[in-house]
Amino acid sequence: MTNKARLRFAPSPTGQIHIGNIRTALFNWLYSRHIDGEFILRVEDTDMNRSVEEYEQIIFRALSWLGLDWDEGPQKGGDFGPYRQSERKDIYHKYANKLLEAGKAYYCYCTEEELEEMREAQRARGEMPRYSGKCADLSSEERAELENEGRKSVIRFKVPENQTIRVNDLVKGEVDFESDGIGDFILIKSDDMASYNFACVVDDYLMNITHVLRGEDHLSNTPKQVMIYEALGFETPEFGHLSLILGPDKAKLSKRHGDTFIGEYREKGYLPEAMVNFLALLGWSPPGEDELFTQDELIRLFDIGRVSKSAAVFDVDKLNWMNSHYIKEADTERLLNLSKEYLINSDLVSQEQLEHDWEWFVSAVDLVKEKIDMLSELPPQLKIFYGDDVDLKGEEVEFLEKDHVPELLSEVINQFNDLDSFEDPKAIKKAVNKAGKQVGVKGKQLFMPVRIAVSGQMHGPELDQLISLLGRERAINRVNSTLSQIQS
């Protein structure tokens, strides 16, 4: 083993990447950076029928989007490659042969039908289904006969009897497993590829992995892996199993709770810094009461000893609050760049118009960004700047029925026409105040009618900035439209 801590994230490219997997990647990445270790990415594509290169690329993009850079792995290389299990078949066979030669593994020729009959018989006897060891002591003649029948073989690990396997888990503490409850399991499958448990052990050893942090759904694999480590004479890494992520109803997080794939959050316009902050707090608690952390702060604070044994609850309201905070704090030009697709797909603006009026759009987004939880909500907020007519409804109409409103709005139009420039919000504010002075109103009786007249809403962005961005012509047209409606 190396003196430097080495952690890995080893996803399978068999589908979209789940929030739980990304949380696992994040914890491994944070801990490796916290202890000045190395973070390795390994693709576990031993399931040749389900592994798809497109999903591999999705994994790479998700990690890169979140800023989880890897020191070794696909696209980057390293001294311990290759980093795809499908490219390491010969390595697995080398170690499987060592176990065969040592009498710690054997060839099994049982068909799926025979295995199912075995399981049914065990269930009928009230036993836990597991492999019976039927092929464990086949002679070379018996093996040859089965092979002549055209049977395909697998290689099974010979599980030691009456053995307690103790795992000192970094999160769960001491966990004991009894070998008698574990049947002889497969090391090399009939397609000649290593099983998950075997490939995982060989790779973790050869890649000098010192810490294995993964979801608690892998806890049941751990005794099998520990037995393989011991059978091969390998040093065992430290294991830590992370609690499940639950939905608000305390059931395991699934599609019925909403989005569960990281790509869906990116598509909706969540910022990577918000996702990292939020996911870091799913099962880990920093010291103190703060909940908002930069990536550097998370690296400095992350301690495996503060990872909870209890399941974490995915609270989308908290995520939305966190994302809205990061949107407010973000550079507005960056937000606009990230929002181009939403704006163009909403038919609010063309690519050409967006490029031509870029500075105007930056100002408009800056004005409304505090109203949104995610960037996909931006187009409806920007609609306030479009159109010359105002659609008045109940409460707004009632407020405009006050006697002073027609005179006030007429004076506002006069003041707008008298302005030398419409680009200075301060000048617009003075013009509105001047109109109020002429009519003899101030405060709510002044600003609310003007706001409703230019936006159709009783609440919204800073009034003077809103009017400035509307421009003189559109602002005056809207006030005239409002006057026409209340005077008709």
Curated annotation (Swiss-Prot):
Cellular component, GO annotation: cytosol
Record key words, sorted: Aminoacyl-tRNA synthetase, ATP-binding, Cytoplasm, Ligase, Metal-binding, Nucleotide-binding, Protein biosynthesis, Zinc
Motif range ('HIGH' region): 11-21
Cofactor(s) recorded in Swiss-Prot or TrEMBL: Zn(2+)
CDD domains (UniProt xref): GluRS_core (cd00808)
Enzyme class: ligase
Residues bound to Zn(2+): 108, 110, 135, 137
Function of the molecule: Catalyzes the attachment of glutamate to tRNA(Glu) in a two-step reaction: glutamate is first activated by ATP to form Glu-AMP and then transferred to the acceptor end of tRNA(Glu).
Assembly and binders: Monomer.
Listed name of the protein: Glutamate--tRNA ligase
Species in which this protein is naturally found: Natranaerobius thermophilus (strain ATCC BAA-1301 / DSM 18059 / JW/NM-WN-LF)
